[in-house]
Amino acid sequence: MSLTEVSLNIPTDHMANVFGQFDVYIKKIEVVSEHFQISLDQMISKNRSKDIARPRQIAMYLCKNMTDTPLDSIGALLGGRDHSTIIHGVQKISDEYESDETTRSIIDTIKKKINPN
């Protein structure tokens, strides 16, 4: 059996669901990048400066807490990062959310942009 045959046997409703989920994740990343006025390229880059890393960690936090996305999928969407990087970013922002009013306000504002209802 060839790769083409295998891929043709995947149910189209399953593929639509997978791609639909990625659209949701990408929207969250886009909203974060727009909020911080940085490009999507910067969000997925290897740049570790605080001006880029913090929004990226907030995107990790939102993808993890607002979806059922596996950590490795979040990492793939954010430039091929390892699941342990995602765990670190999510934990860091989670701690800040609990202890820092500014971080809480930023995240709540971004959540409202993602889900205005």
Q: Over which residues does each language-model region extend?
A:
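Residues that form generic nucleotide/phosphate-binding pockets
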Residues: 14, 31, 35, 113
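Residue-level marker of alpha-helix boundaries and capping positions
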Residues: 19-20, 51
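Basic, low-complexity segments
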Residues: 20-46
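Terminal-proximal interaction/regulatory segments of ATP-powered molecular machines
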Residues: 42-117
